[in-house]
Amino acid sequence: MKIVKISPRGYCYGVVDAMVIARNAALDKSLPRPIYILGMIVHNKHVTDAFEEDGIITLDGPSRLEILDKIDSGTVIFTAHGVSPEVKQRAKEKGLTTIDATCPDVTKTHDLIEAKKAEGYHVIYIGKKNHPEPEGAVGIAPDIVHLIEKADDLKTLEIPTDKILVTNQTTMSQWDVQHLMEDIQKKFPTAEFHKEICLATQVRQEAVAKQADVADLTIVVGDPKSNNSNRLAQVSQEIAGTTAYRVADVSEIQLEWLQGVENVAVTAGASTPTPITKEVIAFLDQYDPMNPATWDRIRKVPLQKILPRVKVKKEQ
């Protein structure tokens, strides 16, 4: 079996920065304990499990405000997905120490929404409902930001002004966003468009679109909650025309997927630890359908290998 290692794949700078911020927090003895992450720091359970070993508690729930209600003291880390001003204010009122690990690309969208609100605009925001990134973006100005996920959402959308900005969640499929923007332009011809697919998401999607078409199968390594990982599988199927499966790690690979497959493409979401992806590639590389000894799919990567290394500051 030939392995097509799609490149680029895996970690983006926003994810690495967020994890380094959280690791440094764990090492900072001056920070009030306990230390919480408000939601998953990035959408990967291997990462959150590794942070648990570092002594950082991940709390998840329907909304950031609801999670915050569970915390009475200590330090709170805001995830790469960003949070609303209301969440920041609530944390301040509760006397919590806060650390902001928001991805710079997400912050740029928040700043854009604030600027356009000041100019009297309404904002149509394309994103996934119940995902933390749209929650934070809508929370910047909930009175003028309208979240839509699909074309059907446009049917009932009414906006009381011609001053309309259209932007989007950074991890969406760029093709889905383009199609929705075309639909929006038909209904709201005066709308201004500001596509905010982050560069890391864009180049990873384009790599799948261009490189997966030579494969019989694509394996996307990523957490089920990772929107960008799920979009990579979608791009493989809809753009490259190659059947795709998303797996959290090697243990989720089904042998029947590999029957008759000569070329398998492998990519990974922006929040997927590199050792987890390497383990998937190593399994596929040694897999022999005629040799049961090669069929074991057991994740062996230790949690201490998941997180990026940080330099420990020497005490003066």
UniProtKB/Swiss-Prot annotation:
Q: What is this protein called?
A: 4-hydroxy-3-methylbut-2-enyl diphosphate reductase
The top EC class, named as a word, is oxidoreductase
Q: Which domain of life is it from?
A: Bacteria
Chain positions recorded as dimethylallyl diphosphate binding sites: H43, H81, H131, S226, N228, S271
Organism expressing this protein natively:
Bacillus mycoides (strain KBAB4)
Residues annotated to bind isopentenyl diphosphate: H43, H81, H131, S226, N228, S271
Q: Name one GO biological process term.
A: terpenoid biosynthetic process
**Alphabetical UniProt keywords:** 4Fe-4S, Iron, Iron-sulfur, Isoprene biosynthesis, Metal-binding, Oxidoreductase
User: Briefly, what is this protein's role?
Assistant: Catalyzes the conversion of 1-hydroxy-2-methyl-2-(E)-butenyl 4-diphosphate (HMBPP) into a mixture of isopentenyl diphosphate (IPP) and dimethylallyl diphosphate (DMAPP). Acts in the terminal step of the DOXP/MEP pathway for isoprenoid precursor biosynthesis.
Taxonomic placement:
Bacteria, Bacillati, Bacillota, Bacilli, Bacillales
UniProt key word Zinc: no
Active site, UniProt feature: E133 (proton donor)
Annotated residues for binding of (2E)-4-hydroxy-3-methylbut-2-enyl diphosphate:
H43, H81, H131, T170, S226, N228, S271
Cite the Gene3D superfamilies for this sequence. 3.40.50.11270, 4-hydroxy-3-methylbut-2-enyl diphosphate reductase, catalytic domain (3.40.1010.20)
Protein's pathway: Isoprenoid biosynthesis; dimethylallyl diphosphate biosynthesis; dimethylallyl diphosphate from (2E)-4-hydroxy-3-methylbutenyl diphosphate: step 1/1; Isoprenoid biosynthesis; isopentenyl diphosphate biosynthesis via DXP pathway; isopentenyl diphosphate from 1-deoxy-D-xylulose 5-phosphate: step 6/6
Q: Kindly state which reaction or reactions the protein catalyses.
A: isopentenyl diphosphate + 2 oxidized [2Fe-2S]-[ferredoxin] + H2O = (2E)-4-hydroxy-3-methylbut-2-enyl diphosphate + 2 reduced [2Fe-2S]-[ferredoxin] + 2 H(+); dimethylallyl diphosphate + 2 oxidized [2Fe-2S]-[ferredoxin] + H2O = (2E)-4-hydroxy-3-methylbut-2-enyl diphosphate + 2 reduced [2Fe-2S]-[ferredoxin] + 2 H(+)
Cited InterPro entries: LytB/IspH
- Which cofactors does it use? [4Fe-4S] cluster
